[in-house]
Amino acid sequence: MGKEKSHINVVVIGHVDSGKSTTTGHLIYKCGGIDKRTIEKFEKEAAELGKGSFKYAWVLDKLKAERERGITIDIALWKFETPKYQVTVIDAPGHRDFIKNMITGTSQADCAILIIAGGVGEFEAGISKDGQTREHALLAFTLGVRQLIVAVNKMDSVKWDESRFQEIVKETSNFIKKVGYNPKTVPFVPISGWNGDNMIEATTNAPWYKGWEKETKAGVVKGKTLLEAIDAIEQPSRPTDKPLRLPLQDVYKIGGIGTVPVGRVETGVIKPGMVVTFAPAGVTTEVKSVEMHHEQLEQGVPGDNVGFNVKNVSVKEIRRGNVCGDAKNDPPKGCASFNATVIVLNHPGQISAGYSPVLDCHTAHIACRFDELLEKNDRRSGKKLEDHPKFLKSGDAALVKFVPSKPMCVEAFSEYPPLGRFAVRDMRQTVAVGVIKSVDKTEKAAKVTKAAQKAAKK
């Protein structure tokens, strides 16, 4: 095996019928983590049900069905490899909680793959005014996913017609430009997810197709297939050099060991012997040990899901939604209020000051009040349209002051991205998304454990 390949996360977006499942299924199937036995089992079932030609989507449907029934599928199934990367597919949308997942996301996507159906009439439906495609693309951009690949699918259904492909590239370029992407940095790849054309091997059906190209800081990059486009994603920098931020997913009490908080390192590193602070709880203590998958670690780095043992802290003092950080290096704090840019996605009425829905930010799930609507902005340029609007409706973007109903720890998106984006949930759906601009932090009278005092003297 040699050196481990770098990990990247991609999110696959597009209209319901664009062929996302088939395309993703195909990649996972051909380059991926599904073992042969499982594939053979699925193929046999598919054939028995007369769904043989459907096998890629069928593979994905099986995985989805198992996931929806609450059987957690080995996440390896959602992985595939390119020459350079190990790629994890973050939740394919269509899933009801997709937007929430993408924001509170267990992982931030490094790149979005937008699948567009090339079929006659289909393309137009996917990109129409109310299209999901627009919402997903806007969301990806708003949440800081800056790299995009466009795959024009179902090219077989238009007989690999060059003029159709060019027309779609032109329309889609305009569309993504409005969202905020620069089309020159985006590869446009014609594919057939169904037949597997131009996914992994270059297609022979389109003599006119010379390949895709995109501009990067390092110059122009070229390729032919979708796999090559994924392999050409620019390596994201992982924020190990920032101060530690680790939102807690759970806190366990383990006999003979004590209190063990669990969560994903978002920025910085966590090591045994470190003195950490939990916010907004205001508890400071020493980390005794750090482990992942039942193995002791010398340090946990961004992306690692770790459990760590802390001294002199009871399970009652810290909880899910708290954030752990280095007590000596920009420790996390609670907040009295924060200002955020909010985009209203779908709210049936009007939102005015006083509205108090639940915000999902990292692992915290807390009701927050829209305290003041400060200004209404143009969604694309961010330019101010009016001061102190009376209300907001679907499609509006605004700067809003929020006041949490309970102590909460959040950060500015510019400093700690994973702790600076949130979903606004109401009526069992995501009504808005937000990006935090500034935070009014509070100092809480802190509890410093004996272990922390001892460690500080060392």
Curated annotation (Swiss-Prot):
Spans annotated as G4: 153-156
Phosphothreonine, modified sites: 72, 82, 259, 430
Domain of life: Eukaryota
Keyword Cytoplasm: yes
Residue(s) of cross-link: Glycyl lysine isopeptide (Lys-Gly) (interchain with G-Cter in ubiquitin): 224, 242, 253, 271, 393, 437
Chain segments carrying region G3: 91-94
Modifications after synthesis and translation: S-thiolated in response to oxidative stress, probably inhibiting the protein and causing a reduction in protein synthesis.
Region spans: G2: 70-74
Binding site for GTP: 21-22, 153-154, 156, 192-194
Gene Ontology CC annotation, any one: eukaryotic translation elongation factor 1 complex
Region feature (G1): 14-21
Effect after changing residue 286 to K: In TEF2-1; strongly reduces translation fidelity by increasing the frequency of frameshifting and amino acid misincorporation
Region annotation (G5) ranges: 192-194
Subcellular location, principal: cytoplasm
tr-type G domain span: 5-240
Gene Ontology MF, one: GTPase activity
Annotated site (Not modified): 298, 372
N6,N6,N6-trimethyllysine sites (modified residues): 79
PTM annotation (N6-methyllysine): residues: 3, 30, 316, 390
Nucleotidyltransferase listed as a keyword: no
Subunit structure: The eukaryotic elongation factor 1 complex (eEF1) is probably a heterohexamer. Two trimeric complexes, each composed of eEF1A (TEF1 or TEF2), eEF1Balpha (EFB1) and eEF1Bgamma (CAM1 or TEF4), are probably dimerized via the eF1Bgamma subunits. Interacts with eEF1Balpha; the interaction is direct. Interacts with GCN2 (via C-terminus); this interaction is direct, occurs in amino acid-repleted cells, may be stabilized in a ribosome-dependent manner, reduces GCN2-mediated eIF-2-alpha phosphorylation and is lost in amino acid-starved cells and by uncharged tRNAs. Interacts with CEX1.
Functional note: GTP-binding component of the eukaryotic elongation factor 1 complex (eEF1). In its active GTP-bound form, binds to and delivers aminoacyl-tRNA to the A-site of ribosomes during protein biosynthesis. In the presence of a correct codon-anticodon match between the aminoacyl-tRNA and the A-site codon of the ribosome-bound mRNA, the ribosome acts as a GTPase activator and the GTP is hydrolyzed. The inactive GDP-bound form leaves the ribosome and must be recycled by its guanine nucleotide exchange factor (GEF) (eEF1B subcomplex) before binding another molecule of aminoacyl-tRNA.
Family in the record: Belongs to the TRAFAC class translation factor GTPase superfamily. Classic translation factor GTPase family. EF-Tu/EF-1A subfamily.
Other remarks on this protein: Present with 827 molecules/cell in log phase SD medium. There are two genes for eEF1A in yeast.
Protein name: Elongation factor 1-alpha
Source organism per UniProt: Saccharomyces cerevisiae (strain ATCC 204508 / S288c) (Baker's yeast)
Taxonomic path: Eukaryota, Fungi, Dikarya, Ascomycota, Saccharomycotina
